[in-house]
């Protein structure tokens, strides 16, 4: 409207000459000019209170997600700082380098102080040792010390040391290379090391078991002992004694031969009174008999005062 009024005034002035304006018209014209002048500085701007203004930034769920990500990054930064401080305190990195360990060009890692470790995994063909003229001390805090390579394991505890291996084991002197103990029975005969008085095993497979000429061979078990041979079992000695709390069972496919002086204590053998009826109940009676050559055999008792003279016996003519 202001532009139309200005155009009409210009046409009137051009056709009729200069036209004098009143004070009111001049004030209105001056106000319009000021508005147009000020609008040049606000070109391209939109009032911030405009309802149709496009809203930017993270709002709603996106804003909450952004806050969670920022908090998570802050927590990770704090954890990283704590780990860095712990590593710095343990390794003791200072102006002069690392005070707790040394790294050498040959690949040697040397610890300069007492180190607390959980599990150590040496590299292939690596060595763990101590300094010259100093002992290497390895201790466990109320736990066993375990050295393991593949299926071979050495466990050192307070009251025992156990070695487990599926491929055998061998002990030798590192200076003289002399084999002290080996389980390679095809090459070396099995001998207990000097100072070892007993060997505790659950199952052993060997060709023979012998003792020294001046000592006895004692085989002790807490439960049941089974001695089995593929081609027979031969027990030889100056004196052979069997002490057991239960039953002793001898089984053989062909025969059982006892050579030498055989002593059988009958105090523990079950016996029945002479007044019992033969064959009463579920019991079957046998009489223990011995041949002149030491062969033992049993005879079923079918009548009173029955002896060992039966037709079917392993003694032959003499019994």
Curated annotation (Swiss-Prot):
Entry's Gene Ontology BP terms: cardiac muscle cell development; gene expression; glucose homeostasis; glucose import in response to insulin stimulus; muscle organ development; response to glucose; vascular associated smooth muscle cell development
Membrane side Cytoplasmic: residue ranges: 1-66
InterPro entries membership: Sarcoglycan, Sgcb
Phylogenetic classification of the source organism: Eukaryota, Metazoa, Chordata, Craniata, Vertebrata
Compositional bias per record (Basic and acidic residues), positions renumbered to this chain: 22-33
Name of the molecule in the record: Beta-sarcoglycan
Cited function: Component of the sarcoglycan complex, a subcomplex of the dystrophin-glycoprotein complex which forms a link between the F-actin cytoskeleton and the extracellular matrix.
Positions of transmembrane segments: 67-87
Entry-linked Pfam families: Sarcoglycan_1
Membrane topology listed for this record: Single-pass type II membrane protein
Family per similarity comment: Belongs to the sarcoglycan beta/delta/gamma/zeta family.
Record bears the keyword Transmembrane: yes
Ranges facing Extracellular side: 88-318
Record's keyword annotation contains Cell membrane: yes
């Amino acid at each position: 409207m202001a532009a139309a009024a200005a155009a009409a005034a210009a046409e009137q002035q051009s056709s009729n000459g200069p036209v004098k304006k009143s004070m009111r018209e001049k004030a209105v014209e001056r106000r319009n000019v000021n508005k147009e002048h000020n609008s040049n500085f606000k070109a391209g701007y939109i009032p911030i209170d405009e309802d149709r203004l496009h809203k930017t930034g993270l709002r709603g769920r996106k804003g909450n997600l952004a806050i969670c990500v920022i908090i998570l990054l802050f927590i990770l930064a704090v954890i990283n700082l704590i780990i860095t401080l712990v590593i710095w305190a343990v390794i003791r990195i200072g102006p002069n380098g690392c005070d707790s360990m040394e790294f050498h060009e040959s690949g040697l890692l040397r610890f300069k102080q007492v180190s607390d470790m959980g599990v150590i995994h040496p590299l292939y063909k690596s060595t763990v040792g101590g300094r010259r003229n100093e002992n290497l001390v390895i201790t466990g805090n109320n736990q066993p010390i375990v050295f393991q390579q593949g299926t071979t394991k050495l466990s050192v505890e307070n009251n025992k040391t156990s070695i487990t291996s599926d491929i055998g084991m061998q002990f030798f002197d590192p200076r003289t290379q002399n084999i002290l103990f080996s389980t390679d029975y095809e090459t070396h005969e099995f001998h207990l090391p000097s100072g070892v008085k007993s060997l505790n095993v659950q199952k052993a497979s060997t060709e023979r078991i012998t003792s020294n000429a001046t000592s006895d061979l004692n085989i002790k078990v807490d439960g049941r002992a089974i001695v089995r041979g593929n081609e027979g079992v031969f027990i030889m000695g100056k004196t052979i004694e069997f002490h057991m709390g239960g039953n002793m069972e001898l089984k053989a496919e062909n025969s059982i031969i006892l050579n030498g002086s055989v002593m059988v204590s009958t105090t523990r053998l079950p016996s029945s009174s002479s007044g019992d009826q033969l064959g009463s109940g579920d019991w079957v009676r046998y009489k223990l008999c011995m041949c002149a050559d030491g062969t033992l055999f049993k005879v079923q008792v079918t009548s009173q005062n029955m002896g060992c003279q039966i037709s079917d016996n392993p003694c032959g003519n003499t019994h």
